[in-house]
Amino acid sequence: MQLTSLPNSQRPREKLIEKGAKALSDAELLAIFLRTGLPGMNVIELAQHLLNENKTLHNLFNASMEEFCAQKGLGTAKYVQLQAVLELSQRYMQERCQRDAIFNSPNAVYDYLTLQMRGLQQEVFMVLYLDSQNRLIKDEILFYGTINSASVYPREVVKAALKNNAAAVIFAHNHPSGIAEPSQADKLITNKLQQALQLVDINVLDHIIVGGETCVSFAERGLI
C-alpha cells in the first residue's frame, strides 16, 4: 500500500505533529528518518523490515558502515545522517547528565559512563573530576590504548586533577571486548594512581570498567 493511500492520522509525519513523537512506533519513527520506501514497499514497511532483520534498534544503530549499507534501502548517505543524529542525541544527554550529575552511588556513575563509552572501539582511560560534594566538574579522556603502567602516567593524572581543582576522582576505562572483568594490570595501575593522588589529598572514589552494557566497580569489590 502506498503511504499516500493512508489517512493522515496513520502517516508517521502527520501523526507526530498531531500526537507527539512518543505516540509513534519504532517503525514509524524510523520511517520518518528513512523518508522514502522502495518499489513495492512503502517506507513504513521498509522500516519494519529493517527492524525485523536487525532484531533490535541497538543492532541497527551500531552496525558498521559496511553492514549498514549492505541492507535494503540503506546507503552511505543514510549511514552518515544516522551517525550525526546519534552523536547529537548523545551530546544532548551528556550535557544534561553533566549539568545534573551528582555521583553518590555506583549506579549513577554506571549510567553516566555507559552513555559516555557506548560503542567505543578503542580502549580509553577516562577521569571524572568531582568537587567536595561529589558533583561532576568535568570528565576527560587522558589516555588511549591498552591500560597498563606503560600507557597511564600517574604524574599526568595528578597534574590534571589539580588543574581541575578536584577534591575526588573516579577512574573509568572500557573493554571493547565486552568483558568488564578487571585484569591484573588494571589493579596495579589503580593502586599506583591511588598512591600518587593521596600525596596531594585527592580521594580516589572508584575505578569502573565498562564492557558493553555491563560495569564493574572496584569500590564494590573492595579493590579500593
Curated annotation (Swiss-Prot):
UniProt keyword annotations, A-Z: Hydrolase, Metal-binding, Metalloprotease, Protease, Zinc
Molecular-function GO term, any one: metallopeptidase activity
GO BP annotations listed: proteolysis
Sequence motif JAMM motif, residues: 173-186
Gene3D superfamilies: Cytidine Deaminase, domain 2
Claim: Protein biosynthesis is one of the keywords in the record: no
Residue spans crossing the bilayer: none
SUPFAM superfamilies the record matches: JAB1/MPN domain (SSF102712), RuvA domain 2-like (SSF47781)
Pfam families on file: RadC (PF04002), UPF0758_N (PF20582)
Binding sites annotated in the UniProt record for Zn(2+): H173, H175, D186
Domain MPN: start-end pairs: 102-224
PANTHER family: DNA REPAIR PROTEIN RADC, UPF0758 PROTEIN YEES-RELATED
Family stated for the protein in its record: Belongs to the UPF0758 family.
Name of the protein in its database record: UPF0758 protein PSHAa2643
